[in-house]
A protein has these predicted regions:
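N-terminal active-site wall of soluble small-molecule enzyme domains
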Residues: 31-101
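Conserved, mostly hydrophobic/aromatic
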Residues: 22, 32-33, 77, 132, ...
Length: 215
């Protein structure tokens, strides 16, 4: 399977010109973080802003819900060009209900695991979801450095998926750059913000990141 790249935006209003520039690249997704001010302290990205993003981009959205009650978001998100909705486990809504609701709309489902969480909390859901999002920084704040222990977590998760004969994808989000991406060969999707957006050539950055995890 071709390794994928998701260009990330953490709650800031995304300039139309940036989205337009990404349209002419082969980036796979626009990764959007949504925060409710409860799961994490920061509050961002109302639904109206997400709607605006889809007006300017042809890319599918990869939505990361850092919220306590994801269920109330799903119906609205289903009206947009959303590929996958990722939620966290330590929330108020029932995970199985979230999975069922996403399936109803034909939307893929992901579960995020934070740096301080052990992999085994994911095990009951691995055969029910499409993706695991390994957080390589603590959720909610931009500009953090990549946490090196995330590499071992990704490698261990890959072994667990092989053992179970599952095709669940592994995505990694947080502080991903050209230096650490080469150690993320067991990831299927790299989520990267500033490495792409702050580069002079978006396509060049995307190509380099993809090569880092392609065998």
């Amino acid at each position: 399977m071709k390794k994928k790249i998701s260009a990330s935006f953490l709650g800031a209003k995304i300039p139309a010109k940036v989205l337009t520039k990404l349209n002419v690249t082969d980036v796979d997704f626009i990764h959007v973080d949504v925060m409710d001010g409860k799961y994490v302290k920061k509050k961002t990205m109302p639904f109206s802003e997400l709607s605006t993003i889809t007006y300017y981009t042809e890319k599918r959205l990869d939505v990361h819900l850092m919220v306590m009650k994801p269920l109330k978001w799903i119906d609205n998100l289903a009206t947009l060009n959303v590929d996958c909705i990722t939620v966290h486990l330590n929330i108020k809504d029932n995970i199985d209900k979230i999975i069922d609701r996403c399936r109803l709309f034909g939307i893929k489902v992901g579960i995020a695991i934070n740096p301080d969480q052990e992999l085994d909390i994911l095990y009951p859901y691995l055969d029910k979801i499409d993706k695991v999002l390994v957080m390589s920084v603590n959720p909610g704040l931009p500009g953090q450095e990549f946490i090196p222990s995330s590499i071992e977590k990704i490698n261990n998760l890959r072994e667990e998926l092989k053992k179970r004969n599952l095709k669940t994808l592994i995505s990694v989000d947080g502080g991903v750059n050209f230096l650490n991406a080469k150690d993320l060969i067991n990831a299927d999707i790299l989520v990267s913000g500033s490495t792409i957006i702050k580069s002079d050539d978006f396509q060049d950055a995307i190509t380099k990141l993809r090569k880092c995890i392609s065998k």
